[in-house]
Amino acid sequence: MEQTPLTYLKQQDEELFSAMRKELKRQRDNIELIASENFVSQAVMEAQGSVLTNKYAEGYPGRRYYGGCEFVDLAENLARDRAKAIFGAEHVNVQPHSGAQANMAVYFTILNQGDTVLGMNLSHGGHLTHGSPVNFSGVQYNFVEYGVDPETEMIDYDVVAKLAEEHKPKLIVAGASAYPRVIDFKRFREIADSVGAYLMVDMAHIAGLVAAGLHPNPVEHAHFVTTTTHKTLRGPRGGMILCKEEHAKAIDKSIFPGIQGGPLMHVIAAKAVAFAEALAPEFKDYIEQVVANAKVLGEELTARGLRIVSGGTDNHLLLVDLQPLGITGKLAEHALDEAGITVNKNTIPFDPASPFVTSGIRIGTAAMTSRGFKEAEMKQIAELIELVLKNPEDQETLTSAHKQVLALTGRFPLYPERG
């Protein structure tokens, strides 16, 4: 019998096979604009679906608690060495299962319960693990929030400095999940030093931009840098910590045995593949196109009367304020999904709506750039978004937009070799 992707799954589990085929069709047919998503290479997927998933490897290369780890040691060392080369880090831990666990490990390394931490407000662009009261970070530690200026909708570093001086945090967290502007890590380090605080940068969203040299590198300034390995870095879903050699043992101990047991060696291998891709010259070309696409998309949406938070973007994402249109993020997400355009509802700075409803949507260009979309396609996307957002409950409009989406995505095949 001819072997094709998912041959054995189809034979053994038709229900799951059907769900996965439907998901592949959704990814192929839709315009994927969720800023935290991307399309990995076939090589990354092959590594993640490899025999390495069978191997338990508690510990670190050369210091495992199980035998037979000599070859998974090679995979982990490749991932670590490549990450060091990309970001110029002295030490890298590639074992975190997620960005949240990477953040947790840093907190556990340097903080005690109740310590004061300065982090970005979630509705202003921060992340759950930056002190949200519903997250372990907000429960275990005393987080003080900074946000953006109400006029510029950008970080006001003077305000951050005043908060740091007032509250004397043990740690300052920089980085965001929905902030479209360049972050001044040098200034953050100066603020941290002025009050004797550690600086941790969560670069999950912009790691690919940092790798390509299109955003300042936080490794030069922060005591600790955490990131996911997907998003703009275009690897498997997972996490990573970068730090100075002086913190290496403490960080490694916080990951294992601190908060994790056996690492996911198949995922670490996939990280190694993605890091090799990020070291290639083509990756910089890709990221340059991601940023160019985001700028054009923002300009086109603005020209069509939509309000972009902070007036534009310096990276891969945009925040659209829907209040002038009189619709919610929840409605916009649903309407766009009906038209085959995938986004997520998102709070905007000073949002009067709840996080379950929101007054905005977040848009990213990393995934569709991976499919080959360029400036011309961004203009078409802007036209479709305008059409849907100005007629979110008109079924005829949504159907018409969906047909145009299918025509557009059909020109840029996704994983054609998967049948």
Curated annotation (Swiss-Prot):
UniProt gene name: glyA
PANTHER family for the chain: SERINE HYDROXYMETHYLTRANSFERASE, SERINE HYDROXYMETHYLTRANSFERASE 1
EC annotation from Swiss-Prot or TrEMBL: 2.1.2.1
Catalytic activity: (6R)-5,10-methylene-5,6,7,8-tetrahydrofolate + glycine + H2O = (6S)-5,6,7,8-tetrahydrofolate + L-serine
Protein name: Serine hydroxymethyltransferase
Pathway involvement of the protein, from the record: One-carbon metabolism; tetrahydrofolate interconversion; Amino-acid biosynthesis; glycine biosynthesis; glycine from L-serine: step 1/1
Taxonomic source organism: Exiguobacterium sibiricum (strain DSM 17290 / CCUG 55495 / CIP 109462 / JCM 13490 / 255-15)
Family per record: Belongs to the SHMT family.
Entry binding sites for (6S)-5,6,7,8-tetrahydrofolate: 122, 126-128, 354-356
Cofactor: pyridoxal 5'-phosphate
Pfam families: SHMT
